[in-house]
Design a protein with these regions (language model features):
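Pocket-lining segment of extracytoplasmic ligand-binding domains
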Residues: 176-268
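Secondary-structure end/capping motifs
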Residues: 232-315
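Conserved C-terminal helix/tail region of periplasmic/extracytoplasmic solute-binding proteins
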Residues: 301-338
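Bacterial signal peptide processing site
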Residues: 25-27
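C-terminal motif of bacterial Sec signal peptides marking the signal peptidase cleavage site
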Residues: 20-23
Length: 338
């Protein structure tokens, strides 16, 4: 996490005197192009893409442009530098900026996913998998200090398994390179998001043995965040953005996965409709998405428990230092009280 913190702080220091290009793109009634930097690209984030595909963003005079940051540290760097208007990643990235003492901390204004969306993949079939099966094994866990790795370690500790004692967590492979490293022989297990996990298993390369999210419980896993200066200039856009995504969550929860899948095809080039539908259903089965895109204090505190357990938290924060639920609450009440 130290390298991630240093990277974020360096970017922050270098951009304090720069005015983001989006600064002149206030709420003036025209179509707003919103630059979104996402931590990775997955069906786990289907409501975001559906809000675009179903025209919900268009209804709010918003056009989105997506960039895959390949990690929360990169997403946060893009937000701090002004290269992205909205960062879409784990809130730990903003928490690290806060506890680092910065006065320019991005605000979390919406939470899409409420648990880990990865699945544990084994090289061999384990129909009766238990966490004790991991004893003596090596697992590709992701970037140290990132929520995926810390959540996984938290689950292991809950099952009395310790890294370096009972098993080995491999933090040496970049998040977006884990699957290819696993395929070429690194480690005994790997965590993967859908549709990658589904297609990996369908190709006979491995076996999904557990849902990490089901084991971890609810945590604020992936959130929308932006600099306060951007939110203040673009309140209508921020609210409209959440309105569109909230509508998309409602749609995906009320619609058969096979009906949803065709709308997502354009966002997952080379992925089959069958794979997308199966992934949507799997995420629905684990109750992955927030209906109201607010963050709860209980889940925020669990996130800090997870980070603290990993030895990566120098002090705890209060939720109101980092989170503004106002816009999410407003659009939820509009949509569900109509």
């Amino acid at each position: 996490m130290k390298n991630a913190k240093q990277k974020i702080c360096t970017v922050l220091a270098s951009c304090l005197t720069l005015l983001p290009l989006s600064a002149c793109n206030g709420d003036n009634g025209d179509v707003k192009t919103v630059q979104i930097n996402e931590v990775t690209h997955s069906v786990f984030y289907a409501p975001l893409y559906l809000a675009d595909a179903l025209g919900y963003f268009e209804e709010e005079n918003i056009k989105i442009e997506l960039t895959n940051g390949g990690g929360a540290d990169n997403v946060m760097s893009a937000v701090l530098s002004g290269d992205a208007d909205i960062g879409f990643c784990g809130p730990e990235a903003a928490l690290y900026v806060l506890i680092g003492g910065s006065s320019d901390v991005p605000t979390v204004f919406g939470q899409l996913t409420k648990r880990d969306g990865s699945f544990l993949v084994s090289r061999v079939a384990e129909p009766n998998f238990t966490w004790e099966n991991l004893k003596g094994k090596e697992i590709l866990a992701g970037r140290k200090g990132g929520v995926p790795a810390m959540t996984f370690e938290y689950i292991l500790n809950e099952h009395n398994l310790k890294d370096g004692v009972d098993l080995t967590l491999n933090y040496n492979v970049a998040f977006n390179m884990m699957t290819s490293a696993f395929e070429t022989g690194t480690a005994d297990y790997c965590t993967m998001f859908d549709p990658v996990a589904y297609e990996y298993e369908a190709a006979g390369k491995g076996y999904v043995v557990a849902s990490v999210g089901e084991a971890s419980g609810e945590v604020p896993y992936t959130c929308f965040m932006a600099k306060n200066s951007w939110i203040e200039r673009n309140e209508t856009t921020a609210e409209g953005f959440l309105r569109a995504v909230t509508k998309a969550v409602k749609y995906i929860n009320e619609t058969d996965a096979a009906t949803v899948a065709p709308y997502l095809l354009a966002y997952f080039e080379g992925t089959s409709e069958t794979s997308i539908a199966a992934s949507v259903q799997r995420y629905r089965d684990i109750d992955a998405w927030r209906t109201n895109l607010t963050m709860t204090e209980t889940s925020f505190n669990r996130l800090q428990d997870i980070i603290e357990n990993a030895g990566e938290l120098s002090r705890r924060a209060t939720m109101n230092e980092l989170v503004n639920n106002t816009y999410a609450d407003k659009v939820y009440n509009e949509i569900y009280n109509d």
